[in-house]
Amino acid sequence: MAESEAPIIEAGKVSKWLTDNGFDHEFLAPDHQGIEIIKGNRDFLIPLATALYAYGFNYLQCQCAYDAGPGEDLVSMYHLVKVSDDVEQPEEIRLKVFVPRDDPRLPSVYWIWKSADFQERESYDMYGIIYEGHPNLKRILMPEDWVGWPLRKDYISPEFYELQDAY
């Protein structure tokens, strides 16, 4: 193999199952712990998430977001776990969905995994990703009147923000 060629990484078990069942996605790679990472399309997030739930991923351990860089996409990431009684090391997968920063909309997975409630609210509060269909999408950490999305890489901090007296 030439030095410039990257090694071919074989798709993981879940990615193969999704492909066999006709679910559009892209296998990215396993992470440093060997957890399979897949990329989903925002237009098909709900069918893909429902398929993963049907596969057995019944627990959303973490939903978070990050900014891929100034001018780049925002990413909503879902860490899913297959929880059962007799498994010492449960199966895990990470699903990433990339959304353009000028139209950061995704369907909410709250109706599949209730644990997405506060996590999607935090991603909305910090990055401005709008989770359509979420039952209570509003700021959770920042004051309601805060302008902007503080964890975006292109965010400009206000020089002064007046804290209001709570008394």
Swiss-Prot record:
* Molecular function GO terms recorded: NADH dehydrogenase (ubiquinone) activity; quinone binding
Compartments where found: Cellular thylakoid membrane
Q: How does it sit in the membrane?
A: Peripheral membrane protein
Q: Which Pfam families match?
A: Complex1_30kDa
Q: Which PROSITE patterns match?
A: COMPLEX1_30K
Task: Tell me which EC number(s) this protein carries.
Answer: 7.1.1.-
Catalytic activity, reaction form: a plastoquinone + NADH + (n+1) H(+)(in) = a plastoquinol + NAD(+) + n H(+)(out); a plastoquinone + NADPH + (n+1) H(+)(in) = a plastoquinol + NADP(+) + n H(+)(out)
Asked whether the keyword Membrane is assigned, the reply is: yes
- Per the record, the domain of life is Bacteria
Chief subcellular location:
membrane
Q: Which GO terms describe its cellular component?
A: plasma membrane-derived thylakoid membrane
GO-annotated biological processes? photosynthesis, light reaction
Q: Which InterPro entries match?
A: NADH_DH_suC, NADH_quin_OxRdtase_su_C/D-like, NADH_UbQ_OxRdtase_30kDa_su, NADH_UbQ_OxRdtase_CS
Could you list this entry's UniProt keywords, alphabetically sorted: Membrane, NAD, NADP, Plastoquinone, Quinone, Thylakoid, Translocase, Transport
Task: Describe its assembly.
Answer: NDH-1 can be composed of about 15 different subunits; different subcomplexes with different compositions have been identified which probably have different functions.
Read off the NCBIfam families from this record: PRK12494.1
Concerning its family, UniProt says:
Belongs to the complex I 30 kDa subunit family.
What's its job? NDH-1 shuttles electrons from an unknown electron donor, via FMN and iron-sulfur (Fe-S) centers, to quinones in the respiratory and/or the photosynthetic chain. The immediate electron acceptor for the enzyme in this species is believed to be plastoquinone. Couples the redox reaction to proton translocation, and thus conserves the redox energy in a proton gradient. Cyanobacterial NDH-1 also plays a role in inorganic carbon-concentration.
Q: What is this protein called?
A: NAD(P)H-quinone oxidoreductase subunit J
